[in-house]
Amino acid sequence: MRIVVIGAGGIGGWLGARLAASGQQVGFLVHDRTLAALRSSGLTLCDCSRGEPGFVTARIEMPLASEDPQALTETLEGQPDLVLVTTKVDALAPLAPALRVLTGPGTGVVSTQNGISAPGLLADAVGREHVLPGVARVYSAVASPGEVRTIGGAGSLALGEWDGAATARSRAAVQALEAAGIRAWIPGSIWAELWRKVSFVVVQGALGAAANAPIGVLRSDLRDAFTRAVSEVVAVAAALGHDLATDAAPDPVAEALRMADAQPAGATTSMQRDIAVGLPSELDAQLGALCRAGDEVGVPTPVLDLAHSVLAPREAVARAGA
């Protein structure tokens, strides 16, 4: 399978290293320091579940990497079967020209970003018929350009067609991911799966950033606010036609609380960490989009709105100084 991974950070490095190590034809669309690192030192994926430095789970000595999408397609001898888009949401609109170069008639373009915004932005670039909304779950981070560390196992990626159809390309993508040691599946509704993640990760990031607190504080001192915020997300999703209940977890709010209770007490989200150090974050793409969705369907989201009101001025300052 010909695969292009856009980005080689925590998500892109994890996916790309595993897929390349399993024998897939993988190219990375990257820039600047990451491009230089991949070309000079390769790509290393380490499992640090038992502490650093961890052990190497995938090592790609000479990965195919370029900042030119046309060069990647030529080296791969054709447009990719699959494009895994792993950059932050802010990068998606500027990526549109590159995505159009990479996307052939049968190419699937997979989103991996947190929040509800990414699939629509990708559809604006290449059309809904190419977009496979994805839900990535892994604890990963960049130790340095070209070196990615994971904690807690190989991770997972759910994906599906925009319209829910069962297709050969989505099944082929799942097979390639499974062969690379990544748990992958096509859920009954990829949109419900996306909203399930939003109900936990975006709430954790929003309340955690507003309170400057890790999950250990949110699930104890701020448990009531956390519960109400999750309930708001579940209600918005339901108004949009997405039932977040499953056979294994019939109460999605209780399931989010169970997940919160299972996290390491010091856990934070990437959006939360960006806000904490004054960097531009995905606040609008994650929390802002969620609040707007509530407004559009007439579902009140007072806890989420309050968190957004607290954080929006900080985000404006961060972007003004960027």
Report the location of each language-model feature.
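Rossmann-like NAD(P)(H) cofactor-binding subdomain of soluble oxidoreductases
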Residues: 55-147
